Protein backbone atom coordinates (compact mmCIF):
# COMPACT_ATOMS: atom_id res chain seq x y z
CA UNK A 1 0.00 0.00 0.00
CA UNK A 2 1.40 3.38 -0.97
CA UNK A 3 0.35 6.57 0.73
CA UNK A 4 0.63 10.04 -0.68
CA UNK A 5 -0.31 13.15 1.24
CA UNK A 6 -0.91 16.33 -0.69
CA UNK A 7 -1.70 19.40 1.37
CA UNK A 8 -3.45 22.29 -0.26
CA UNK A 9 -5.54 25.22 0.82
CA UNK A 10 -8.71 25.38 -1.23
CA UNK A 11 -11.31 28.08 -1.50
CA UNK A 12 -14.31 27.13 -3.59
CA UNK A 13 -17.03 29.19 -1.95
CA UNK A 14 -19.00 31.34 -4.32
CA UNK A 15 -20.18 34.02 -1.91
CA UNK A 16 -22.05 37.23 -2.43
CA UNK A 17 -22.05 39.89 0.25
CA UNK A 18 -24.63 42.65 0.09
CA UNK A 19 -24.23 45.47 2.56
CA UNK A 20 -27.72 46.89 2.71
CA UNK A 21 -28.83 50.25 4.02
CA UNK A 22 -32.47 51.20 3.88
CA UNK A 23 -34.15 54.58 4.31
CA UNK A 24 -37.77 55.50 3.72
CA UNK A 25 -38.47 58.67 1.79
CA UNK A 26 -40.54 61.37 3.50
CA UNK A 27 -41.93 62.48 0.16
CA UNK A 28 -45.66 61.63 0.12
CA UNK A 29 -45.52 61.18 -3.66
CA UNK A 30 -43.44 58.08 -2.97
CA UNK A 31 -46.45 56.33 -1.43
CA UNK A 32 -48.80 54.13 -3.45
CA UNK A 33 -52.51 53.55 -2.91
CA UNK A 34 -51.88 50.36 -0.93
CA UNK A 35 -49.56 52.18 1.43
CA UNK A 36 -46.34 50.96 -0.15
CA UNK A 37 -43.58 53.52 0.01
CA UNK A 38 -40.25 53.85 -1.73
CA UNK A 39 -37.38 52.37 0.24
CA UNK A 40 -33.83 53.00 -0.85
CA UNK A 41 -31.49 50.03 -0.70
CA UNK A 42 -27.80 50.64 -1.20
CA UNK A 43 -25.89 47.40 -1.67
CA UNK A 44 -22.32 46.32 -2.04
CA UNK A 45 -22.50 43.14 -4.06
CA UNK A 46 -19.48 40.86 -4.23
CA UNK A 47 -18.64 37.43 -5.59
CA UNK A 48 -15.56 35.59 -4.39
CA UNK A 49 -13.93 32.43 -5.73
CA UNK A 50 -15.58 29.53 -7.49
CA UNK A 51 -14.81 26.94 -10.12
CA UNK A 52 -15.50 26.95 -13.82
CA UNK A 53 -16.96 24.12 -15.85
CA UNK A 54 -18.56 22.85 -19.03
CA UNK A 55 -16.84 24.05 -22.19
CA UNK A 56 -14.90 26.48 -20.00
CA UNK A 57 -12.46 23.82 -18.83
CA UNK A 58 -11.22 24.23 -15.30
CA UNK A 59 -7.65 25.43 -15.00
CA UNK A 60 -7.25 25.77 -11.25
CA UNK A 61 -8.96 25.40 -7.92
CA UNK A 62 -8.20 29.02 -7.14
CA UNK A 63 -10.98 31.55 -7.37
CA UNK A 64 -12.24 31.91 -10.91
CA UNK A 65 -15.85 32.61 -11.76
CA UNK A 66 -17.96 33.89 -14.59
CA UNK A 67 -21.13 35.39 -13.14
CA UNK A 68 -23.13 37.33 -15.68
CA UNK A 69 -26.70 37.03 -14.44
CA UNK A 70 -27.18 38.33 -10.89
CA UNK A 71 -30.82 38.69 -9.82
CA UNK A 72 -32.58 39.79 -6.66
CA UNK A 73 -36.10 38.52 -5.94
CA UNK A 74 -38.35 39.86 -3.17
CA UNK A 75 -40.39 37.72 -0.76
CA UNK A 76 -42.52 38.90 2.16
CA UNK A 77 -44.45 37.64 5.19
CA UNK A 78 -47.27 39.46 7.06
CA UNK A 79 -45.92 40.76 10.36
CA UNK A 80 -48.75 39.16 12.34
CA UNK A 81 -47.80 35.71 11.03
CA UNK A 82 -44.11 36.02 11.86
CA UNK A 83 -43.17 33.47 14.50
CA UNK A 84 -46.40 31.49 14.12
CA UNK A 85 -47.23 28.22 12.40
CA UNK A 86 -48.51 30.27 9.47
CA UNK A 87 -45.23 32.07 8.86
CA UNK A 88 -44.34 31.93 5.18
CA UNK A 89 -42.54 34.24 2.82
CA UNK A 90 -44.24 34.45 -0.56
CA UNK A 91 -43.02 36.00 -3.76
CA UNK A 92 -43.69 39.72 -4.16
CA UNK A 93 -43.43 41.07 -7.70
CA UNK A 94 -41.76 44.46 -8.10
CA UNK A 95 -43.89 47.35 -9.36
CA UNK A 96 -41.14 49.45 -10.92
CA UNK A 97 -41.46 49.32 -14.70
CA UNK A 98 -38.23 47.57 -15.71
CA UNK A 99 -38.15 45.15 -12.77
CA UNK A 100 -41.85 44.37 -13.19
CA UNK A 101 -41.25 43.15 -16.73
CA UNK A 102 -38.76 40.56 -15.49
CA UNK A 103 -40.08 39.91 -12.00
CA UNK A 104 -36.75 40.65 -10.34
CA UNK A 105 -34.02 43.27 -9.99
CA UNK A 106 -30.83 42.87 -12.01
CA UNK A 107 -27.32 43.74 -10.88
CA UNK A 108 -26.07 44.69 -14.33
CA UNK A 109 -22.47 45.15 -13.22
CA UNK A 110 -22.06 41.37 -13.19
CA UNK A 111 -21.50 40.86 -16.89
CA UNK A 112 -18.57 38.48 -17.19
CA UNK A 113 -17.88 36.51 -20.33
CA UNK A 114 -14.16 35.81 -20.56
CA UNK A 115 -11.67 35.83 -18.97
CA UNK A 116 -12.88 34.73 -15.58
CA UNK A 117 -12.96 37.61 -13.17
CA UNK A 118 -10.86 36.58 -10.20
CA UNK A 119 -8.39 34.65 -12.32
CA UNK A 120 -7.51 37.91 -14.06
CA UNK A 121 -7.71 40.21 -11.03
CA UNK A 122 -5.10 38.80 -8.64
CA UNK A 123 -7.69 36.31 -7.39
CA UNK A 124 -9.60 39.12 -5.70
CA UNK A 125 -13.38 38.96 -5.28
CA UNK A 126 -15.61 40.87 -7.63
CA UNK A 127 -17.69 43.57 -5.96
CA UNK A 128 -20.07 46.23 -7.22
CA UNK A 129 -22.19 48.95 -5.65
CA UNK A 130 -25.88 48.55 -6.37
CA UNK A 131 -28.84 50.75 -5.46
CA UNK A 132 -32.54 50.09 -5.92
CA UNK A 133 -35.59 51.90 -4.57
CA UNK A 134 -38.44 49.39 -4.42
CA UNK A 135 -41.92 50.08 -3.10
CA UNK A 136 -42.43 48.05 0.08
CA UNK A 137 -45.68 47.81 2.01
CA UNK A 138 -45.95 48.50 5.73
CA UNK A 139 -46.68 45.60 8.04
CA UNK A 140 -44.57 43.00 6.25
CA UNK A 141 -41.24 41.32 6.86
CA UNK A 142 -39.22 41.35 3.65
CA UNK A 143 -36.60 38.87 2.58
CA UNK A 144 -34.38 39.32 -0.47
CA UNK A 145 -33.26 36.28 -2.46
CA UNK A 146 -30.19 36.58 -4.66
CA UNK A 147 -29.74 34.11 -7.52
CA UNK A 148 -26.55 34.10 -9.56
CA UNK A 149 -26.01 32.26 -12.84
CA UNK A 150 -23.41 32.22 -15.60
CA UNK A 151 -25.58 31.45 -18.63
CA UNK A 152 -26.66 34.91 -19.76
CA UNK A 153 -24.92 34.56 -23.12
CA UNK A 154 -25.58 30.86 -23.67
CA UNK A 155 -27.84 30.05 -26.61
CA UNK A 156 -29.18 26.77 -25.24
CA UNK A 157 -29.60 27.18 -21.50
CA UNK A 158 -29.56 24.09 -19.32
CA UNK A 159 -31.49 25.65 -16.42
CA UNK A 160 -35.11 26.68 -16.43
CA UNK A 161 -36.28 30.19 -15.59
CA UNK A 162 -37.71 30.33 -12.04
CA UNK A 163 -41.51 30.48 -12.13
CA UNK A 164 -42.68 32.45 -9.11
CA UNK A 165 -46.37 33.29 -8.65
CA UNK A 166 -47.09 36.42 -6.64
CA UNK A 167 -48.47 35.76 -3.15
CA UNK A 168 -48.36 32.01 -3.88
CA UNK A 169 -44.79 30.77 -4.38
CA UNK A 170 -43.15 30.30 -1.00
CA UNK A 171 -39.47 30.95 -0.48
CA UNK A 172 -39.02 27.39 0.79
CA UNK A 173 -40.63 26.00 -2.38
CA UNK A 174 -38.71 28.07 -4.93
CA UNK A 175 -36.83 25.76 -7.27
CA UNK A 176 -34.77 25.59 -10.45
CA UNK A 177 -34.49 22.55 -12.70
CA UNK A 178 -32.63 21.35 -15.75
CA UNK A 179 -34.50 22.02 -18.96
CA UNK A 180 -36.12 19.12 -20.80
CA UNK A 181 -33.69 19.69 -23.65
CA UNK A 182 -30.75 19.43 -21.25
CA UNK A 183 -32.09 16.21 -19.74
CA UNK A 184 -32.73 14.65 -23.13
CA UNK A 185 -29.26 15.63 -24.34
CA UNK A 186 -27.71 14.20 -21.18
CA UNK A 187 -29.24 10.81 -21.86
CA UNK A 188 -27.34 10.73 -25.15
CA UNK A 189 -24.05 12.09 -23.84
CA UNK A 190 -22.71 14.30 -21.08
CA UNK A 191 -24.81 16.09 -18.49
CA UNK A 192 -23.75 19.72 -18.04
CA UNK A 193 -25.03 21.93 -15.24
CA UNK A 194 -24.28 25.63 -15.12
CA UNK A 195 -22.94 27.58 -12.17
CA UNK A 196 -25.72 28.47 -9.72
CA UNK A 197 -25.74 30.04 -6.28
CA UNK A 198 -28.13 31.85 -3.97
CA UNK A 199 -28.60 33.38 -0.53
CA UNK A 200 -30.87 35.53 1.62
CA UNK A 201 -30.45 38.37 4.10
CA UNK A 202 -28.48 37.55 7.22
CA UNK A 203 -27.40 39.41 10.32
CA UNK A 204 -23.91 40.71 9.69
CA UNK A 205 -22.56 39.50 13.04
CA UNK A 206 -24.55 36.35 13.86
CA UNK A 207 -25.08 35.24 10.23
CA UNK A 208 -28.61 34.19 11.19
CA UNK A 209 -31.51 34.89 8.85
CA UNK A 210 -32.52 38.52 9.26
CA UNK A 211 -35.62 39.62 7.33
CA UNK A 212 -36.53 43.31 7.49
CA UNK A 213 -39.77 44.65 8.98
CA UNK A 214 -41.11 47.63 7.05
CA UNK A 215 -43.23 50.19 8.93
CA UNK A 216 -44.02 53.86 8.49
CA UNK A 217 -41.05 54.57 10.75
CA UNK A 218 -38.60 52.49 8.73
CA UNK A 219 -35.59 54.69 8.12
CA UNK A 220 -32.55 52.47 7.89
CA UNK A 221 -31.40 48.88 8.06
CA UNK A 222 -28.10 47.14 7.53
CA UNK A 223 -27.71 43.49 6.54
CA UNK A 224 -25.44 41.14 4.61
CA UNK A 225 -26.47 38.65 1.97
CA UNK A 226 -24.12 35.71 1.59
CA UNK A 227 -24.89 33.41 -1.29
CA UNK A 228 -23.35 29.96 -1.60
CA UNK A 229 -23.54 27.30 -4.27
CA UNK A 230 -26.73 25.42 -5.03
CA UNK A 231 -24.71 22.91 -7.01
CA UNK A 232 -21.72 20.70 -6.30
CA UNK A 233 -18.43 20.92 -8.14
CA UNK A 234 -16.56 18.03 -9.76
CA UNK A 235 -12.89 18.07 -10.78
CA UNK A 236 -11.00 15.10 -12.21
CA UNK A 237 -7.32 15.88 -12.85
CA UNK A 238 -5.40 12.74 -13.84
CA UNK A 239 -2.11 11.71 -15.44
CA UNK A 240 -0.46 8.59 -16.87
CA UNK A 241 -3.72 7.04 -18.00
CA UNK A 242 -3.03 3.32 -18.59
CA UNK A 243 -2.96 2.36 -22.26
CA UNK A 244 -4.10 -1.19 -21.48
CA UNK A 245 -6.80 -2.14 -19.00
CA UNK A 246 -8.71 -5.31 -18.22
CA UNK A 247 -12.45 -5.51 -18.68
CA UNK A 248 -14.54 -6.12 -15.57
CA UNK A 249 -18.14 -5.46 -16.59
CA UNK A 250 -20.86 -7.37 -14.78
CA UNK A 251 -21.76 -10.43 -16.80
CA UNK A 252 -18.46 -10.68 -18.67
CA UNK A 253 -17.69 -14.32 -19.44
CA UNK A 254 -13.94 -13.68 -19.59
CA UNK A 255 -11.50 -10.86 -19.00
CA UNK A 256 -10.24 -8.98 -22.05
CA UNK A 257 -7.26 -6.64 -22.13
CA UNK A 258 -7.96 -3.63 -24.33
CA UNK A 259 -6.74 -0.12 -25.18
CA UNK A 260 -9.41 2.42 -24.21
CA UNK A 261 -10.40 5.25 -26.52
CA UNK A 262 -12.08 7.25 -23.78
CA UNK A 263 -12.14 7.66 -20.01
CA UNK A 264 -15.26 9.06 -18.35
CA UNK A 265 -16.45 9.90 -14.86
CA UNK A 266 -19.99 8.72 -14.16
CA UNK A 267 -22.50 9.39 -11.38
CA UNK A 268 -24.79 6.43 -10.78
CA UNK A 269 -27.58 8.78 -9.74
CA UNK A 270 -28.09 12.52 -10.24
CA UNK A 271 -31.17 14.66 -9.67
CA UNK A 272 -32.31 17.29 -12.14
CA UNK A 273 -33.85 19.87 -9.81
CA UNK A 274 -32.88 21.82 -6.69
CA UNK A 275 -34.68 23.80 -4.03
CA UNK A 276 -33.07 27.23 -4.06
CA UNK A 277 -33.40 27.97 -0.36
CA UNK A 278 -32.60 24.53 1.09
CA UNK A 279 -29.98 23.74 -1.56
CA UNK A 280 -31.15 20.16 -1.87
CA UNK A 281 -33.23 18.04 -4.20
CA UNK A 282 -37.01 18.26 -3.74
CA UNK A 283 -38.70 15.00 -2.84
CA UNK A 284 -40.44 14.82 -6.23
CA UNK A 285 -37.37 15.64 -8.32
CA UNK A 286 -36.64 13.55 -11.39
CA UNK A 287 -33.29 11.79 -11.48
CA UNK A 288 -30.97 10.37 -14.11
CA UNK A 289 -29.03 7.14 -13.64
CA UNK A 290 -25.54 6.22 -14.83
CA UNK A 291 -24.98 9.73 -16.08
CA UNK A 292 -21.67 10.73 -17.67
CA UNK A 293 -20.36 13.99 -16.20
CA UNK A 294 -17.19 14.32 -18.25
CA UNK A 295 -15.16 12.38 -20.82
CA UNK A 296 -11.51 12.42 -21.86
CA UNK A 297 -11.08 11.60 -25.54
CA UNK A 298 -7.99 9.36 -25.66
CA UNK A 299 -7.62 9.35 -29.44
CA UNK A 300 -4.81 10.97 -31.48
CA UNK A 301 -7.20 13.74 -32.53
CA UNK A 302 -7.05 14.98 -28.93
CA UNK A 303 -3.26 14.95 -28.87
CA UNK A 304 -2.71 11.50 -27.32
CA UNK A 305 -0.18 8.87 -28.33
CA UNK A 306 0.49 5.47 -26.76
CA UNK A 307 3.85 4.78 -25.13
CA UNK A 308 4.25 1.02 -25.56
CA UNK A 309 7.20 0.89 -23.17
CA UNK A 310 5.56 2.66 -20.24
CA UNK A 311 2.13 1.45 -21.33
CA UNK A 312 0.50 4.85 -20.81
CA UNK A 313 -1.16 7.53 -22.88
CA UNK A 314 1.19 10.43 -23.54
CA UNK A 315 0.33 14.04 -24.29
CA UNK A 316 2.29 17.28 -24.37
CA UNK A 317 1.91 19.59 -21.43
CA UNK A 318 -0.59 22.42 -21.78
CA UNK A 319 1.27 25.49 -20.56
CA UNK A 320 -1.72 27.73 -21.11
CA UNK A 321 -3.91 25.69 -18.78
CA UNK A 322 -1.08 24.59 -16.54
CA UNK A 323 -1.62 20.88 -17.16
CA UNK A 324 1.41 18.66 -16.73
CA UNK A 325 2.73 16.36 -19.42
CA UNK A 326 0.47 13.32 -19.90
CA UNK A 327 -2.29 14.88 -17.81
CA UNK A 328 -5.83 16.08 -18.43
CA UNK A 329 -8.61 17.71 -16.45
CA UNK A 330 -12.38 17.54 -16.77
CA UNK A 331 -14.90 19.33 -14.59
CA UNK A 332 -18.59 19.93 -14.16
CA UNK A 333 -21.29 20.99 -11.74
CA UNK A 334 -23.93 18.64 -10.35
CA UNK A 335 -27.33 19.08 -8.76
CA UNK A 336 -27.35 17.94 -5.11
CA UNK A 337 -28.48 14.32 -4.91
CA UNK A 338 -29.45 12.24 -1.85
CA UNK A 339 -27.65 8.98 -1.15
CA UNK A 340 -30.81 6.98 -1.81
CA UNK A 341 -30.68 7.86 -5.52
CA UNK A 342 -27.38 6.02 -6.07
CA UNK A 343 -27.27 2.77 -8.05
CA UNK A 344 -25.06 -0.31 -8.28
CA UNK A 345 -21.74 -0.18 -10.07
CA UNK A 346 -21.66 -1.75 -13.53
CA UNK A 347 -18.56 -3.78 -12.68
CA UNK A 348 -18.47 -7.40 -11.58
CA UNK A 349 -18.65 -6.45 -7.89
CA UNK A 350 -21.99 -4.67 -8.46
CA UNK A 351 -21.79 -2.81 -5.16
CA UNK A 352 -23.62 0.48 -4.70
CA UNK A 353 -21.48 3.52 -5.42
CA UNK A 354 -21.81 7.22 -6.22
CA UNK A 355 -19.06 7.71 -8.82
CA UNK A 356 -16.93 5.47 -11.00
CA UNK A 357 -14.38 5.82 -13.79
CA UNK A 358 -15.34 4.18 -17.07
CA UNK A 359 -12.72 3.01 -19.58
CA UNK A 360 -14.01 1.80 -22.95
CA UNK A 361 -12.98 1.18 -26.53
CA UNK A 362 -16.59 1.08 -27.66
CA UNK A 363 -16.84 -2.68 -27.20
CA UNK A 364 -15.17 -3.54 -23.90
CA UNK A 365 -15.63 -1.81 -20.57
CA UNK A 366 -13.84 -1.33 -17.29
CA UNK A 367 -15.53 0.32 -14.29
CA UNK A 368 -13.39 1.45 -11.35
CA UNK A 369 -15.40 2.58 -8.36
CA UNK A 370 -14.37 5.88 -6.81
CA UNK A 371 -14.25 6.16 -3.05
CA UNK A 372 -13.86 9.17 -0.83
CA UNK A 373 -11.25 9.41 1.88
CA UNK A 374 -13.19 9.47 5.11
CA UNK A 375 -13.07 7.85 8.52
CA UNK A 376 -16.82 7.46 8.87
CA UNK A 377 -19.70 6.36 6.71
CA UNK A 378 -19.79 4.48 3.43
CA UNK A 379 -16.70 5.21 1.34
CA UNK A 380 -18.40 4.38 -1.94
CA UNK A 381 -22.04 5.39 -1.61
CA UNK A 382 -22.60 8.93 -0.36
CA UNK A 383 -24.76 11.95 -1.20
CA UNK A 384 -23.74 14.71 -3.56
CA UNK A 385 -24.09 17.87 -1.50
CA UNK A 386 -24.48 21.46 -2.66
CA UNK A 387 -21.50 23.76 -2.18
CA UNK A 388 -19.09 20.81 -1.93
CA UNK A 389 -16.27 20.04 -4.31
CA UNK A 390 -15.62 16.42 -5.28
CA UNK A 391 -12.11 16.19 -6.63
CA UNK A 392 -9.47 13.74 -7.79
CA UNK A 393 -6.01 15.25 -8.10
CA UNK A 394 -4.89 18.68 -6.93
CA UNK A 395 -4.30 21.94 -8.75
CA UNK A 396 -3.97 25.48 -7.47
CA UNK A 397 -1.49 28.32 -7.71
CA UNK A 398 0.85 26.45 -5.38
CA UNK A 399 0.05 22.78 -6.08
CA UNK A 400 -0.08 20.96 -9.40
CA UNK A 401 -0.50 17.25 -8.72
CA UNK A 402 -2.73 15.20 -11.01
CA UNK A 403 -3.81 11.77 -9.80
CA UNK A 404 -1.54 9.07 -11.25
CA UNK A 405 -3.83 6.39 -12.68
CA UNK A 406 -1.00 4.09 -13.75
CA UNK A 407 0.73 4.08 -10.37
CA UNK A 408 -2.46 3.19 -8.56
CA UNK A 409 -4.02 0.96 -11.19
CA UNK A 410 -4.89 -2.54 -10.00
CA UNK A 411 -6.18 -5.06 -12.56
CA UNK A 412 -8.84 -6.44 -10.21
CA UNK A 413 -10.26 -3.18 -8.90
CA UNK A 414 -9.02 0.32 -8.36
CA UNK A 415 -10.33 2.11 -5.31
CA UNK A 416 -9.76 5.73 -6.20
CA UNK A 417 -9.93 8.22 -3.37
CA UNK A 418 -12.04 11.28 -3.95
CA UNK A 419 -11.86 14.17 -1.53
CA UNK A 420 -14.91 16.20 -0.58
CA UNK A 421 -13.94 19.82 -0.08
CA UNK A 422 -16.44 21.91 1.89
CA UNK A 423 -17.17 25.37 0.58
CA UNK A 424 -14.84 27.15 2.96
CA UNK A 425 -11.11 27.72 2.83
CA UNK A 426 -9.61 24.77 4.62
CA UNK A 427 -6.48 22.64 4.56
CA UNK A 428 -6.97 18.98 3.62
CA UNK A 429 -4.85 15.88 3.33
CA UNK A 430 -5.39 13.88 0.16
CA UNK A 431 -4.61 10.26 0.93
CA UNK A 432 -4.30 7.58 -1.72
CA UNK A 433 -3.98 3.90 -0.94
Protein language model annotation of sequence segments:
Residues 22-433:
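Extracytoplasmic cysteine-anchoring/structural motifs
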Amino acid sequence: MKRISIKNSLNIILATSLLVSCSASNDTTDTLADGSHAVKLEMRVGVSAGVVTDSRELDTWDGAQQVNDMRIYVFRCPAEKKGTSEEAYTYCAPVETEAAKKGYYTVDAFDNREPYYSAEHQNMPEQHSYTIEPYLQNGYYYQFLAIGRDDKYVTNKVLTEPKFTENVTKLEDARIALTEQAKNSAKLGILNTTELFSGILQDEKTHEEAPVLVTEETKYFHRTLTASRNVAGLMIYVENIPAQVESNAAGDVSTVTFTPTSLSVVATGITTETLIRQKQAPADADSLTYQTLGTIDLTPSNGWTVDATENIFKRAEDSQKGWKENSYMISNFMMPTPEGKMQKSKNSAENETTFYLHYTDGTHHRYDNIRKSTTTGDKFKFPIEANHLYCLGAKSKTVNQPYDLKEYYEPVMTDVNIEIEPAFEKRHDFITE
